[in-house]
Each structure stands twice: as C-alpha cells, then as structure tokens.
C-alpha cells in the first residue's frame, strides 16, 4: 500500500474567532491530481495556505509524508511545495529568459551555483522549456510587455526547475479567455505528469474540475461536502454545491 503524501485529520482554521475551515478530513496519495472546488470564499485558498503552513491551523493535524504539522520539522518542508498563484509573481523589468534563468539558478545545488556560471546545457534547457510553453519567440521580450496568459506561461515554465513534490495551484486561469485558460491548465497537467508530482488545484469552474482532475474535493460553508473520483461525478451533481 502506498503511503499518503498528505493527510488532513479533523483540521479547522479560524481567524479572529470566525471559522474559515471546519473539521476537514481527507487523504491524498502521491501523483494524484486533485481539484478543490467551490464558490469564492468557502476556504479553498485558506486550505492551500494550511498545507504550506502559511496559516496555522486552529485544530486537528496535517501530515505531509508522515510528518505532523505541529512538528518543528514541518516548517522545513516548504521547499517540497511549488505554488502557482492566480496573479503572476514576476518582475516587470525582467526579460523572459532572465525570469526563467533566475528560477533555474535558485534551484541548483549550492556547489552547482558555486562552480556554474551559465552552462550551455542549462541555456539549451531553458530554450526548450520556453518552446514547450509556446514562448520561444518571446525570449527577449520584457515581462511587462506580455499578456496575462503569456505571463502565466512564464510562471509555468519556471515550475520545470522546481524540485518539489507537490504543486499547489490557486485559480491559475483568472482573467484569461477560455482558449488561453485551457492552454494554461493543459501545460500544468503536462508539467505535473512529467515531474510525477502531486497536483492540487483550486477552481470554481465545474467543467475545469471535471476535465483536469482525478478526484474532486468540494467545499461549501467552510466544510468538506464531497470527496469522490472525478469519473464517478457529473456536472449536474457538482452544480448542486453552488445552491443553498
């Protein structure tokens, strides 16, 4: 039996006395593609922040690879999580190539950073990745001159150099037209498969949930109301969580 990568055991989160999450329980296995589904404000982003320990839970325990969230070693596990936000976190004055190079350099081991200036092999790898995300012709463009969809592609390209085990994605298609939204999600799925990563992505879009996940965990009124394999679900059933 495969050991779970992530376990939520009776997890609750409060802020200034107000509940953000209530008694959340689930288990995620390595390599699963999980969708967190629900309306805005139900606690989806808060749940991601609990995983990374950005928010401290009020009750219960989170386990990552068997290490409990109240264990001091849990805070040292942040490098095991890559995070893709709905707003690209890029420097406007960077060239596209430099944004990728900086991420690649940051993920090199210390001895590689010490002795590596900018090896041809890494340069070629960056160009190859930019080609995979359809940005090769934008390599010398400045970030501020890119569209929203192109900026998200740069963020996805940066992920190829991450050494993490879990990819957390928070509404990555916000503000994008439908065609570009699907392209971004397809790139994210492609990346997660290539790196054999566990993927947890947040969306309020039922069709995206059905298309891109193995399993859907739905939140409503701060509580978990559904946890089921995607191939057992229908659009009609999922739409019920949006009705009071």
Curated annotation (Swiss-Prot):
A molecular-function term among this protein's GO annotations: ATP hydrolysis activity
Domain called ABC transporter: residue spans: 6-241
Keyword Oxidoreductase carried by entry: no
Signal peptide: none
Gene3D superfamilies (UniProt xref): P-loop containing nucleotide triphosphate hydrolases
Residue numbers binding ATP: 38-45
Keywords from the UniProt entry: ATP-binding, Nucleotide-binding, Transport
A Pfam match: ABC_tran
Function: Part of a high-affinity transport system.
Family indicated by similarity: Belongs to the ABC transporter superfamily.
Matches recorded under PANTHER family: METAL TRANSPORT SYSTEM ATP-BINDING PROTEIN TM_0124-RELATED, MOLYBDATE IMPORT ATP-BINDING PROTEIN MOLC
Name of the protein in question: Probable ABC transporter ATP-binding protein p29
Organism annotation: Mycoplasma pneumoniae (strain ATCC 29342 / M129 / Subtype 1)
């Amino acid at each position: 039996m495969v050991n779970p990568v992530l376990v939520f055991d009776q997890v609750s989160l409060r802020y200034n006395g107000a509940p953000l999450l209530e008694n959340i329980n689930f288990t995620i296995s390595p390599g699963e593609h999980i969708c967190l589904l629900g309306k805005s404000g139900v606690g989806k982003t808060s749940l991601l922040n609990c995983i990374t320990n950005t928010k401290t839970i009020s009750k219960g325990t989170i386990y990552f690879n068997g290490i409990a969230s109240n264990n001091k070693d849990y805070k040292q596990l942040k490098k095991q999580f890559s995070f893709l936000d709905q707003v690209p976190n890029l420097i406007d004055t960077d060239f596209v190539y430099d944004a990728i190079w900086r991420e690649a350099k940051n993920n090199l081991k210390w001895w590689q950073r010490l002795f590596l200036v900018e090896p041809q092999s890494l340069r070629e790898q960056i160009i190859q990745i930019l080609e995979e995300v359809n940005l090769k012709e934008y390599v010398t463009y400045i970030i501020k001159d890119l569209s929203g969809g192109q900026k998200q592609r740069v963020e996805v390209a940066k992920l190829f150099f991450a050494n993490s085990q879990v990819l957390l994605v928070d509404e990555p298609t916000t503000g994008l037209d439908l065609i570009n939204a699907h392209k971004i999600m397809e790139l994210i799925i492609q990346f997660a498969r290539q790196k054999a990563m566990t993927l947890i992505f947040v969306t309020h879009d039922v069709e995206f949930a059905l298309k891109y996940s193995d399993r859907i965990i739905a939140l409503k009124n701060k509580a978990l109301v559904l946890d089921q394999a995607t191939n057992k679900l229908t659009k009609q059933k999922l739409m019920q969580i949006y009705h009071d």
